[in-house]
């Protein structure tokens, strides 16, 4: 009889197990999660899935909490030390378990696109005949749209160091610290950093103006990288000043060296254009000559118009580039070439006139010298008795002594000469050496000697 009872019990056990399981399932109680039915988070960031234990749960209830991905048997987070969690969520999903405060929230950090799913919470106890299962909540993971912020205190000035800060204030502190990277052509050095910011010390140069500076932030927990690029606005004094020259309709050419020379034809139109670098732009002005600091410019712009170049424009012109951080200037020397029909023709005529005058003077001297020699060769020896000295006073106060002599070309027995008839005689003139005096009004004196017999 006893054996028959044992046999009947063993045969009925398979039939009783489904009933026992059904009773256990009947003891599973459900509760509603508080808050929205779905949450949105950007990849690389953090999100908190709120969960609150049911108020009907006895204070003496002790068990373990489990968060599950819908359709999965392995939890994504739990406080049960004997339970394994999914590899994909290990270290990123955490159960914030606090039975006293009824807290069963799920913390997700370093969110990834694969985390996009529905989740639910289950509460189980090994000593209780029933458990609790929450309603489902959907988590949507979107692409990261936030970008780093770059802040610059004040103005970047050439040669002066400044601290630039790259920050990501939207990053959660519980996540994996991001990696900051800086890219710039300017001289830089890294400063202090936190989980949400990085400081870069930069000493810009004039050539760094308008160049790019990039801050790149990588989130290693999610494998996402974001960056921001700005253009540097560097203040610097002028480094180069150049003059572009326009002569009439000819093409422009540029002068970069100081005190350069430029030949210009008289009457030609000239346009000088001054250009300088510097940031902010320098104030350009033109001066004639080499100006002092407080000199008055002839043009308050970078353009100097000379519509007709003449003698007044010959000389130096200076362009000055004034800047709060320093000034620079460049000078240009103009040399005026005169037109051939103008001054050049007059000079040529003067040369020809002087040449002709000299030639005529030499011819006169030559003729006078030849005549003088012929007269001396034809003059006979004179009798001293027939020489009569004649004194002539000049207007300059000098006395000249003249000796006259009768020279006969025929014998004495020639026919008599009338008293009234004038005879031609020769005179020998002796000029005493006169000391040179200042030139005065020229007087011409004539002497006529007549001898009557």
Swiss-Prot record:
Family listed: Belongs to the immunoglobulin superfamily. SIGLEC (sialic acid binding Ig-like lectin) family.
Domain Ig-like C2-type intervals: 148-231, 238-333
Membrane topology (Cytoplasmic): 369-453
Spans within the Extracellular topological domain: 27-347
Top-rank taxon, per record: Eukaryota
ITIM motif, short sequence motif: residues: 424-429
Domain Ig-like V-type span(s) in chain numbering: 28-123
Comment block on domains: Contains 1 copy of a cytoplasmic motif that is referred to as the immunoreceptor tyrosine-based inhibitor motif (ITIM). This motif is involved in modulation of cellular responses. The phosphorylated ITIM motif can bind the SH2 domain of several SH2-containing phosphatases.
Function: Putative adhesion molecule that mediates sialic-acid dependent binding to cells. Binds to alpha-2,6-linked sialic acid. The sialic acid recognition site may be masked by cis interactions with sialic acids on the same cell surface.
Protein name in UniProt: Sialic acid-binding Ig-like lectin 6
Gene Ontology cellular component annotations, sorted alphabetically: cytosol; extracellular region; membrane; plasma membrane
Transmembrane segments: 348-368
Taxonomic lineage of the native organism: Eukaryota, Metazoa, Chordata, Craniata, Vertebrata
Biological processes annotated in GO: cell adhesion; cell-cell signaling
PANTHER family: SIALIC ACID BINDING IMMUNOGLOBULIN-LIKE LECTIN, SIALIC ACID-BINDING IG-LIKE LECTIN 6
Keywords recorded for this protein, A-Z: Cell adhesion, Cell membrane, Disulfide bond, Glycoprotein, Immunoglobulin domain, Lectin, Membrane, Repeat, Secreted, Signal, Transmembrane, Transmembrane helix
GO molecular function, a single term: carbohydrate binding
Ranges spanned by the short sequence motif SLAM-like motif, renumbered to the chain: 444-449
Signal peptide (residue range): 1-26
Expressing tissues: Expressed at high levels in placenta (cyto- and syncytiotrophoblastic cells) and at lower levels in spleen, peripheral blood leukocytes (predominantly B-cells) and small intestine.
């Amino acid at each position: 009889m006893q054996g028959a009872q044992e046999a009947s019990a063993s045969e009925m056990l398979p039939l009783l197990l489904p009933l026992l399981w059904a009773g256990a399932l009947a003891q599973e109680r459900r509760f509603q999660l508080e808050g929205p039915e779905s949450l949105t988070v950007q990849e690389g960031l953090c999100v908190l899935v709120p969960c609150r234990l049911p108020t009907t749960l006895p204070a003496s209830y002790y068990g373990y909490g489990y968060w599950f991905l819908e359709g999965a048997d392995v939890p994504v987070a739990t406080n049960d030390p004997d339970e394994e969690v999914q590899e994909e969520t290990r270290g990123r999903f955490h159960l914030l378990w606090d039975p006293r405060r009824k807290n069963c929230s799920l913390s997700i950090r370093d969110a990834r696109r694969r985390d996009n799913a529905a989740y639910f919470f289950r509460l189980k106890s090994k000593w209780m005949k029933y458990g609790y299962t929450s309603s489902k909540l959907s988590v949507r993971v979107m692409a990261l749209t936030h970008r780093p912020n770059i802040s610059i205190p004040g103005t970047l000035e050439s040669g002066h160091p400044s601290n630039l800060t790259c920050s990501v204030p939207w990053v959660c502190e519980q996540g994996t610290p991001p990696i900051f990277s800086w890219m710039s052509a300017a001289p830089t050095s890294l400063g202090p950093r936190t989980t949400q910011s990085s400081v870069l010390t930069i000493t810009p140069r004039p050539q760094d103006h308008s160049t790019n500076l990039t801050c790149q932030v990588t989130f290693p927990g999610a494998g996402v990288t974001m960056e921001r690029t700005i253009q540097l606005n560097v203040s610097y004094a002028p480094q180069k000043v150049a003059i572009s020259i326009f002569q009439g309709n000819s093409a422009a050419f540029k002068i970069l060296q100081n005190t350069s020379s430029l030949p210009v034809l008289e009457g030609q139109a000239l346009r000088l254009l001054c250009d300088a670098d510097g940031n902010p732009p320098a104030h350009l002005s033109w001066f004639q000559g080499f100006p002092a600091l407080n000199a008055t410019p002839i043009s308050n712009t970078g353009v100097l118009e000379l519509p007709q170049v003449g003698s007044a424009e010959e000389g130096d012109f200076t362009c000055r580039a004034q800047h709060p951080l320093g000034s620079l200037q460049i000078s240009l020397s103009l040399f005026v070439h005169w037109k051939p029909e103008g001054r050049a023709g007059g000079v040529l005529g003067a040369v020809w006139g002087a040449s002709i005058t000299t030639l005529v003077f030499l011819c006169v001297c030559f003729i006078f010298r030849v005549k003088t020699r012929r007269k001396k060769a034809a003059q006979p020896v004179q009798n001293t008795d027939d020489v009569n000295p004649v004194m002539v006073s000049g207007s300059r106060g000098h006395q000249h002594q003249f000796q006259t002599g009768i020279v006969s070309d025929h014998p004495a027995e020639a026919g008599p000469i009338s008293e009234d008839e004038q005879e031609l005689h020769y005179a020998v003139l002796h000029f005493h050496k006169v000391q040179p005096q200042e030139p005065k009004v020229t007087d011409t004196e004539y002497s006529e000697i007549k001898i009557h017999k």
